[in-house]
C-alpha cells in the first residue's frame, strides 16, 4: 500500500486544467491509496465553509466520494485555506489535523506541516499570519455575509501578490535553524511540507542524526505527488492534459 501527499494545488475556477488533473488523481491513484494527506493551499483562497458555489461543491464531491470508498483523508490548513474548518470536514469525511503533526510512515516517525511557519525570516508575513489566526477575528469574519467576505479576500489576495513582488526569494524560503528546531521538538528525522513551491529532497546532519526534508511541489504547471510506502518515497509529477 502507498500513502500519498499533495499540497499547493491552488484550485480555482479560472484554472480548469489544475482541477481536471486533481479530479483524475482523486479518481485513479488516490482511490487505491492507504491514506491521502493534503498539506494546505488546496484552494487559491478559501473564503469559508459557507461557500456553496458549484466549484466548491465539485471539490467537496470528490473528497466525499474518496472517503466513502474507505480512503482516509487528512488535511492541514495552509496560508490560503486556513478558514477551511470542521463544517467542510464533516461534509466531506476528511480529518482536520493540527498545524504541526507527527505521523507514523511504515515504521518511520515524520513531522508534517504546511511549511509557512518555517519561513521565519519573512517577518511581515509571520505578523500577518499571527493576526489572521486570532480566534476572535476569525469568529467575526465567519459571520460576515459570504459576498462581503469574497470582496475582502479579493483585496487581501491583491495585497499579497504585490507584497511578494517586493520580497527576495531567500526571505520566502524556510529557515534551516527553524527546520532543525521543529524536527528536534518532535523527535523526528523526517519532515514533509509544502508552501515554498520548491520541490526537492534535502538531506542534512543535525541534532546528532541524519535527517531528511521533503518539499512538495505546487500544481501551477503540473501536478506534484509524493508517494510513500514501506520501500521508501518518490516525489513525482503529473502532467496536465493539453
Curated annotation (Swiss-Prot):
Top-rank taxon: Bacteria
Pfam families linked to this entry: Metallophos (PF00149)
Membrane topology (UniProt): Peripheral membrane protein
UniProt: Mn(2+) 2 binding residues: 41, 79, 114, 195
Residues that hold Mn(2+) 1 according to the record: 8, 10, 41, 197
Cofactors named for this entry: Mn(2+)
Pathway of action: Glycolipid biosynthesis; lipid IV(A) biosynthesis; lipid IV(A) from (3R)-3-hydroxytetradecanoyl-[acyl-carrier-protein] and UDP-N-acetyl-alpha-D-glucosamine: step 4/6
Family according to the record: Belongs to the LpxH family.
HAMAP family linked: LpxH
Name of this chain's protein: UDP-2,3-diacylglucosamine hydrolase
Source species of the chain: Vibrio parahaemolyticus serotype O3:K6 (strain RIMD 2210633)
Amino acid at each position: 500500500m502507498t500513502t500519498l501527499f499533495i499540497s499547493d494545488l491552488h484550485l480555482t475556477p479560472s484554472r480548469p486544467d489544475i482541477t481536471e488533473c486533481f479530479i483524475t488523481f482523486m479518481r485513479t491513484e488516490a482511490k487505491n491509496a492507504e491514506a491521502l494527506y493534503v498539506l494546505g493551499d488546496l484552494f487559491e483562497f478559501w473564503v469559508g465553509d459557507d461557500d456553496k458555489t458549484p466549484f466548491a461543491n465539485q471539490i467537496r464531491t470528490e473528497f466525499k466520494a474518496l472517503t466513502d470508498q474507505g480512503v482516509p483523508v487528512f488535511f492541514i490548513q495552509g496560508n490560503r485555506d486556513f478558514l477551511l474548518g470542521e463544517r467542510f470536514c464533516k461534509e466531506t469525511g476528511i480529518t482536520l489535523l493540527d498545524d504541526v503533526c507527527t505521523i507514523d510512515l511504515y515504521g518511520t516517525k515524520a513531522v508534517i506541516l504546511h511549511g509557512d511557519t518555517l519561513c521565519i525570516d519573512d517577518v511581515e508575513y509571520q505578523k500577518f499570519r499571527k493576526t489572521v489566526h486570532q480566534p476572535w477575528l476569525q469568529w467575526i469574519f465567519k459571520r460576515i455575509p459570504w459576498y462581503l467576505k469574497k470582496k475582502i479576500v479579493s483585496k487581501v489576495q491583491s495585497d499579497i501578490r504585490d507584497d511578494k513582488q517586493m520580497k527576495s526569494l531567500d526571505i520566502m524560503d524556510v529557515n534551516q535553524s527553524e527546520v532543525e528546531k521543529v524536527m528536534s521538538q518532535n523527535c523526528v528525522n523526517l519532515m514533509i511540507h509544502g508552501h515554498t513551491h520548491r520541490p526537492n529532497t534535502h538531506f542534512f546532519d543535525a541534532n546528532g542524526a541524519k535527517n531528511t526534508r521533503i518539499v512538495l511541489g505546487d500544481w501551477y504547471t503540473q501536478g506534484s505527488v509524493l508517494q510513500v510506502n514501506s520501500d521508501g518515497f518518490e516525489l513525482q509529477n503529473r502532467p496536465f492534459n493539453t
